[in-house]
Amino acid sequence: MEKSGPQRRRLAAALRLLSVEGVNSDGPKEVYAEAAEMLEEVVKGLRKEPRRMRRVGFRQGKDGFGKREFDFGMVDLSPVSGLANPLAPPLRVQRNEEKRATGTVVYPGSVRTGTGWVHHGYVAASVDEVFGAVLAWMGQPIMTGILDVRFLRPCPVEEEVRIDGWVRRESGGVVFTEARVEVAEGPVAEAHAVFFIVGEDQYKRFEEQRNRKLVAGC
């Protein structure tokens, strides 16, 4: 991945633009037929390449807060924030404090609903991603248990959206989080979530199952 990373990200960026043009353009059928044939050939070529195995676990060393970050094996490949994943808008997340992070994203026109706004499912996924980043930096191998998003107004496409997420409290193996979603015009949504700490061993089992399926072509 390290050697091909820049070109993977370039490919993903091109595919994002393709998705927007595929939705917004209105050309003759021949244009789309030609594009489809070209892409189908590209897919055939990529399917001949080896499958990429993912690795999870704690990273070496500690950060400035004395924590060991947990790597979910999704660097660059997350469907929400991965620069090498064409499905990602992508969301960019920065750490502010030990238990707080901020995400920014500009949703493309390809996620526009019939009313012209961003599909709320994308906003909810972005909130979940910000929470996951906070907990990964805290060294917590977690899974989402409950994600409750209350929308206050529609979310615009092609405008910067800011998501602030933080840990409200921890109790045993459960972490409670909150978030606020805003655009220039004001608040878009408020969110609360409950995460369960599942541990590194459980994530290792998930990793093994996932990699076996990749090898089998599932």
Short names for language-model regions:
Residues 1-2, 29, 130-162, 167:
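Hydrophobic beta-strand-centered segment that forms part of the acyl-chain substrate-binding groove
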Residues 1-67, 155-157, 168-218:
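HotDog/MaoC-like acyl-thioester-processing domains
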Residues 34-111:
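Long amphipathic N-terminal alpha/beta scaffold segment
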Residues 94-96, 166-170:
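Short beta-strand micro-motifs enriched in acidic
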Residues 96-100, 118-142:
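Active-site helix/loop of acyl-thioester processing domains in fatty-acid/polyketide metabolism
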Residues 107-121:
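Short histidine-centered catalytic/ligand-binding loop motif
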